[in-house]
């Protein structure tokens, strides 16, 4: 990986994205139980989501392992190495899914983005992809973005 910073030092990282359908906020340890419930109820659905080609994630980790993973994502966010957002229902604050924004392995000025929604909220996958795609284009300083396209059924 090159030595360029993922985002410029003076860039103010967005703390949220709000739409009528969902709200994004930085993922952290405080989301552990709800995050764990969201992805463990949707493993096959997530594995069939564009951007998860190897079918190995999510794995069978424990809730304690999930907490460590959320801590790592929060640390990455704090140190600007990557940005993971939880996707929340704006009315109930239930976790709908996640969005991961990390540097491309070959060019850290480019972002590789993945997202998922829980199976029970599958209808939000395309609206989430559309909103995040526009947000990345208009509010982030990346030289380019790789984010697997969503096609309506």
Roles of regions detected by a PLM:
Residues 1-120, 131, 135-153:
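GNAT-family acyltransferases
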Residues 123:
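Conserved polymerase palm-domain catalytic core
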Residues 126-129:
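Mature exported/compartmentalized surface modules and terminal targeting/interaction regions
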